[in-house]
C-alpha cells in the first residue's frame, strides 16, 4: 500500500470524479486576504468546511450515548464563521463530495493551523467505495470560544492505494453512512 501523489489525485478527480468540487492547486488567499489553505498538496488534498454546523449543547440531555444519540443535543447553525463554546464540539460537513475507488483507503488529519489553537479535527478513514460528503468533528479543547471558518481548509486527506483489491468494500457491506449529504449524526 502506497501513498498517492498530487498527480494521481488530480487525475482521479478530473477523470473519475473522485472529489467534487475539485481544486487542482493549493489556495492560500481569497479576495486578497490570507485563508486556511485548501486544495491539492504534494501527497494529499486539503478539504474545506461547508457553512452548515451542529453545535453541541448540554441543555437538553444529561448523557451522551452513541447508540441512542439525542438530536436535541445540537443547535443548528449556518454561517461563514462558527463559534464553538469552550470545551465543547461541533459537527460540520465538507464542501467536497468524495467517491473513493475500490482499491483506496484514506486517512484524514486535522490541519496544524487549527491544532496549534487547541482545535482538533477528527474524521474517520474513507473506506473503499465509500461516497458522500464527509462529516467533520471539531473539538474545542480550550477554555475559550473557538472559531471555525466555512469555505476554508480544515483537514488533509491522504490517499493510500492497495496492490490488491479488497474482498468486501464499504458499498458492498451497505455501510450506514454511504451517500450522506448533510451533517450526519451517529447511527448504529
UniProtKB/Swiss-Prot annotation:
CDD domains: trimeric_dUTPase. Homotrimer. One of its GO terms (molecular function) is nucleotide binding. Catalyzes the deamination of dCTP to dUTP. HAMAP family: dCTP_deaminase. This is dCTP deaminase. SUPFAM superfamilies: dUTPase-like (SSF51283). Pfam families: DCD. Gene3D superfamilies: 2.70.40.10. It is an enzyme of class 3 (hydrolase). The active site is at residue 137. InterPro entries: dCTP_deaminase, dUTPase-like_sf, dUTPase_trimeric. It comes from the Bacteria. Belongs to the dCTP deaminase family. Keywords: Hydrolase, Nucleotide metabolism, Nucleotide-binding. DCTP binds at residues 111-116, 135-137, 156, 170, 180. It catalyses: dCTP + H2O + H(+) = dUTP + NH4(+). Pathway: Pyrimidine metabolism; dUMP biosynthesis; dUMP from dCTP (dUTP route): step 1/2. Its EC number is 3.5.4.13. One of its GO terms (biological process) is dUMP biosynthetic process.
Amino acid at each position: 500500500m502506497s501513498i498517492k501523489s498530487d498527480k494521481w489525485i488530480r487525475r482521479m478527480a478530473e477523470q473519475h470524479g473522485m472529489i467534487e468540487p475539485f481544486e487542482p492547486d493549493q489556495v492560500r488567499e481569497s479576495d486578497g486576504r490570507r485563508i486556511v489553505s485548501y486544495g491539492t498538496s504534494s501527497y494529499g488534498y486539503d478539504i474545506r468546511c461547508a457553512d452548515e454546523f451542529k453545535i453541541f449543547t448540554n441543555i437538553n440531555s444529561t448523557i451522551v450515548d452513541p447508540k441512542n444519540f439525542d438530536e436535541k443535543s445540537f443547535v443548528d447553525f449556518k454561517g461563514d464563521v462558527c463559534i464553538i463554546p469552550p470545551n465543547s464540539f461541533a459537527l460540520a460537513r465538507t464542501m467536497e463530495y468524495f467517491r473513493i475507488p475500490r482499491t483506496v483507503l484514506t486517512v484524514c488529519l486535522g490541519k496544524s493551523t487549527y491544532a496549534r489553537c487547541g482545535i482538533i479535527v477528527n474524521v474517520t478513514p474513507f473506506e473503499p467505495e465509500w461516497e458522500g460528503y464527509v462529516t467533520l468533528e471539531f473539538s474545542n479543547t480550550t477554555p475559550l470560544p473557538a472559531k471555525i471558518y466555512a469555505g476554508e481548509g480544515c483537514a488533509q486527506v491522504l490517499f493510500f492505494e492497495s496492490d490488491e483489491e479488497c474482498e468486501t468494500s464499504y458499498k458492498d457491506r451497505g455501510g450506514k453512512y454511504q451517500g450522506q449529504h448533510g451533517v450526519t449524526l451517529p447511527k448504529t
